[in-house]
Protein backbone atom coordinates (compact mmCIF):
# COMPACT_ATOMS: atom_id res chain seq x y z
CA UNK A 1 0.00 0.00 0.00
CA UNK A 2 1.25 3.47 -0.85
CA UNK A 3 0.45 5.96 1.91
CA UNK A 4 3.36 8.42 1.62
CA UNK A 5 4.62 9.88 -1.65
CA UNK A 6 7.76 12.00 -1.87
CA UNK A 7 8.16 14.06 -5.03
CA UNK A 8 11.50 15.65 -5.90
CA UNK A 9 11.03 18.83 -7.91
CA UNK A 10 13.41 21.37 -9.38
CA UNK A 11 12.94 24.53 -11.42
CA UNK A 12 12.91 22.82 -14.81
CA UNK A 13 9.84 22.88 -17.08
CA UNK A 14 9.59 19.11 -16.58
CA UNK A 15 8.72 19.67 -12.91
CA UNK A 16 5.19 20.68 -13.89
CA UNK A 17 4.71 17.33 -15.65
CA UNK A 18 6.24 15.47 -12.70
CA UNK A 19 3.89 17.29 -10.34
CA UNK A 20 0.84 16.40 -12.48
CA UNK A 21 1.81 12.70 -12.38
CA UNK A 22 2.27 13.01 -8.63
CA UNK A 23 -1.16 14.59 -8.12
CA UNK A 24 -2.83 11.71 -9.94
CA UNK A 25 -0.90 9.10 -7.97
CA UNK A 26 -1.45 10.80 -4.62
CA UNK A 27 -5.18 11.11 -5.22
CA UNK A 28 -5.45 7.51 -6.45
CA UNK A 29 -3.77 6.20 -3.32
CA UNK A 30 -5.27 8.78 -0.92
CA UNK A 31 -1.68 9.26 0.19
CA UNK A 32 0.17 12.00 2.05
CA UNK A 33 2.45 14.11 -0.11
CA UNK A 34 5.90 15.55 0.59
CA UNK A 35 7.21 18.12 -1.89
CA UNK A 36 11.00 18.41 -1.95
CA UNK A 37 13.40 20.80 -3.62
CA UNK A 38 17.13 20.41 -3.06
CA UNK A 39 19.23 23.54 -3.46
CA UNK A 40 22.51 22.54 -5.04
CA UNK A 41 25.33 24.46 -6.65
CA UNK A 42 25.39 21.62 -9.19
CA UNK A 43 21.95 22.57 -10.54
CA UNK A 44 22.13 23.89 -14.08
CA UNK A 45 20.21 27.03 -13.11
CA UNK A 46 21.97 27.80 -9.82
CA UNK A 47 24.20 30.89 -9.53
CA UNK A 48 27.80 30.39 -10.64
CA UNK A 49 30.43 30.04 -7.95
CA UNK A 50 32.39 33.31 -7.72
CA UNK A 51 35.65 31.42 -7.18
CA UNK A 52 35.33 30.17 -10.73
CA UNK A 53 33.98 33.37 -12.24
CA UNK A 54 35.96 36.16 -10.62
CA UNK A 55 39.59 35.50 -9.85
CA UNK A 56 41.35 38.83 -10.09
CA UNK A 57 44.81 39.59 -11.38
CA UNK A 58 46.38 38.67 -8.05
CA UNK A 59 44.16 35.62 -7.60
CA UNK A 60 42.04 37.44 -5.05
CA UNK A 61 38.32 36.89 -4.94
CA UNK A 62 36.55 40.18 -5.57
CA UNK A 63 34.25 41.17 -2.71
CA UNK A 64 31.84 42.61 -5.27
CA UNK A 65 31.57 39.18 -6.86
CA UNK A 66 31.07 37.52 -3.48
CA UNK A 67 28.22 39.93 -2.66
CA UNK A 68 26.76 39.43 -6.12
CA UNK A 69 26.90 35.66 -5.68
CA UNK A 70 25.28 35.90 -2.26
CA UNK A 71 22.48 38.08 -3.67
CA UNK A 72 21.98 35.75 -6.65
CA UNK A 73 21.85 32.73 -4.35
CA UNK A 74 19.28 34.40 -2.05
CA UNK A 75 17.13 35.19 -5.10
CA UNK A 76 17.54 31.61 -6.40
CA UNK A 77 16.52 30.23 -3.01
CA UNK A 78 13.46 32.51 -2.73
CA UNK A 79 12.26 31.84 -6.29
CA UNK A 80 12.66 28.10 -5.74
CA UNK A 81 10.65 28.24 -2.52
CA UNK A 82 7.90 30.27 -4.20
CA UNK A 83 7.61 27.65 -6.95
CA UNK A 84 7.47 24.88 -4.36
CA UNK A 85 4.72 26.75 -2.47
CA UNK A 86 2.77 27.09 -5.74
CA UNK A 87 2.86 23.31 -6.08
CA UNK A 88 1.87 22.97 -2.40
CA UNK A 89 -1.13 25.28 -2.89
CA UNK A 90 -2.33 23.23 -5.87
CA UNK A 91 -2.03 19.99 -3.90
CA UNK A 92 -3.92 21.44 -0.92
CA UNK A 93 -6.65 22.73 -3.26
CA UNK A 94 -6.92 19.16 -4.57
CA UNK A 95 -7.61 18.04 -1.00
CA UNK A 96 -4.25 16.39 -0.38
CA UNK A 97 -2.43 16.33 2.94
CA UNK A 98 0.79 18.06 1.90
CA UNK A 99 4.13 19.04 3.39
CA UNK A 100 7.09 20.74 1.77
CA UNK A 101 10.77 21.03 2.42
CA UNK A 102 13.57 22.87 0.70
CA UNK A 103 17.10 22.12 1.79
CA UNK A 104 20.72 22.26 0.66
CA UNK A 105 22.86 19.32 -0.34
CA UNK A 106 23.56 16.59 -2.80
CA UNK A 107 20.18 15.94 -4.45
CA UNK A 108 20.48 12.15 -4.66
CA UNK A 109 21.54 11.75 -1.06
CA UNK A 110 18.97 14.22 0.26
CA UNK A 111 16.15 12.45 -1.61
CA UNK A 112 17.21 9.05 -0.25
CA UNK A 113 17.69 10.33 3.30
CA UNK A 114 14.31 12.08 3.37
CA UNK A 115 12.57 9.07 1.82
CA UNK A 116 13.94 6.94 4.63
CA UNK A 117 13.35 9.35 7.52
CA UNK A 118 9.84 10.29 6.32
CA UNK A 119 9.00 6.61 5.62
CA UNK A 120 8.06 7.25 1.99
CA UNK A 121 6.48 4.38 0.11
CA UNK A 122 7.11 5.95 -3.29
CA UNK A 123 9.48 8.56 -4.70
CA UNK A 124 8.39 10.42 -7.83
CA UNK A 125 11.06 12.21 -9.81
CA UNK A 126 12.19 13.06 -13.29
CA UNK A 127 15.26 12.42 -15.32
CA UNK A 128 17.15 14.85 -17.51
CA UNK A 129 17.71 12.59 -20.50
CA UNK A 130 21.48 13.11 -20.52
CA UNK A 131 23.69 11.11 -22.85
CA UNK A 132 25.51 8.09 -21.43
CA UNK A 133 28.81 9.95 -21.63
CA UNK A 134 27.44 12.96 -19.72
CA UNK A 135 25.96 10.65 -17.08
CA UNK A 136 29.31 8.91 -16.73
CA UNK A 137 31.11 12.20 -16.09
CA UNK A 138 28.46 14.06 -14.09
CA UNK A 139 26.47 11.24 -12.57
CA UNK A 140 22.72 11.01 -12.47
CA UNK A 141 20.47 11.91 -9.57
CA UNK A 142 17.76 9.51 -10.75
CA UNK A 143 20.28 6.67 -11.16
CA UNK A 144 21.64 7.29 -7.67
CA UNK A 145 18.15 7.35 -6.15
CA UNK A 146 16.99 4.20 -7.95
CA UNK A 147 19.95 2.29 -6.52
CA UNK A 148 19.94 3.71 -2.97
CA UNK A 149 16.40 4.64 -1.92
CA UNK A 150 14.57 2.20 0.39
CA UNK A 151 11.26 2.34 -1.54
CA UNK A 152 9.82 2.22 -5.04
CA UNK A 153 10.57 4.95 -7.58
CA UNK A 154 8.22 6.36 -10.23
CA UNK A 155 10.38 7.97 -12.91
CA UNK A 156 8.88 10.57 -15.26
CA UNK A 157 10.73 10.81 -18.57
CA UNK A 158 11.12 14.19 -20.34
Describe the residue ranges of each PLM region.
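Small/aliphatic-rich secondary-structure junction motif
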Residues: 3-67, 94, 99
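Short secondary-structure boundary segments
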Residues: 37, 127-128, 158
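Structural beta-alpha unit
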Residues: 42-43, 74, 78-123
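Short, flexible loop segments at boundaries between secondary-structure elements
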Residues: 151-158
Amino acid sequence: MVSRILVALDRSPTSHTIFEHTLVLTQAYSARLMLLHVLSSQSSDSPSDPRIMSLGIEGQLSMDWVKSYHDQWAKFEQESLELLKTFEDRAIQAGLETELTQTYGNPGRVICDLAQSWNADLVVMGRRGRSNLTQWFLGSVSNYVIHHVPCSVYLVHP
